[in-house]
């Protein structure tokens, strides 16, 4: 029995050592993809969602007033989320450090790309807007030509646009929105892009155009 335990441990050790991030083999990619997903990334994503839920459950919306397009925390409210967002940042960094697989200039682990987007979103909720823009720019620059990263690149562009608007730089948001908005988008992305346009025009003081986009977003809103 002791022999089999030692043999199993030795085989497992050889497998783990063999699954290097420097080898572009299917088994290596799947090992690091699975490990990143179900360990660090999962925990970081859960921490982020817990933080968002905590804020949304405490936030009381006044339905007698015009509701905001987005239910985001202000700078003071964001401090309550710091511990959850910091955990998301920590776990995302762990994914990137331990599971990044770059070959011929392209990232092969989709959860590394997702980890960068989680970093951007966590920074956004912490009101660290410059760092949010840096993370979004990195995603666009490094993964913009990778098919498996199309989803994350879209959300990074949208988040960058929203961040610019919140910083009072609406002029910088328009090209990002224009670049994101296409008829080929999924229903969810199409709706979110319309909503972002409404936010852009509203914050720019162009109320008639904002109203048009709010109406369009209302028509494409998902039904529960």
PLM features per residue range, with description:
Residues 1-8:
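Bacterial N-terminal signal peptides that target proteins for export
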Residues 19-224:
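Acidic, polar-rich low-complexity tracts and alpha-helical solenoid repeat scaffolds
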């Amino acid at each position: 029995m002791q022999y089999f335990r030692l043999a199993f441990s030795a085989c497992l050790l050889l497998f783990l050592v063999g699954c290097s991030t420097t080898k572009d083999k299917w088994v290596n990619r799947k090992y690091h993809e699975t490990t990143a997903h179900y360990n660090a990334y999962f925990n970081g994503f859960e921490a982020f969602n817990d933080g968002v839920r905590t804020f949304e459950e405490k936030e009381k919306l006044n339905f007698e007033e015009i509701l905001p397009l987005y239910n985001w925390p202000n700078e003071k409210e964001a401090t309550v989320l710091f511990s959850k967002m910091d955990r998301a940042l920590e776990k995302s960094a762990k994914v990137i450090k331990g599971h990044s697989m770059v070959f011929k200039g392209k990232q092969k682990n989709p959860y590394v790309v997702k980890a960068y987007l989680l970093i951007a979103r966590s920074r956004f909720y912490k009101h660290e807007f410059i760092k949010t823009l840096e993370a979004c720019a990195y995603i666009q620059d490094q993964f913009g030509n990778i098919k498996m990263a199309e989803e994350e690149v879209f959300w990074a562009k949208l988040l960058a646009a929203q961040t610019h608007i919140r910083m009072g730089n609406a002029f910088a948001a328009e090209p990002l929105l224009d670049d994101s908005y296409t008829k080929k988008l999924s229903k969810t992305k199409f709706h979110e892009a319309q909503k972002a346009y409404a936010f852009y025009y509203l914050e720019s003081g162009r109320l008639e155009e904002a109203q048009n986009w709010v109406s369009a977003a209302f028509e494409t809103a998902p039904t529960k």
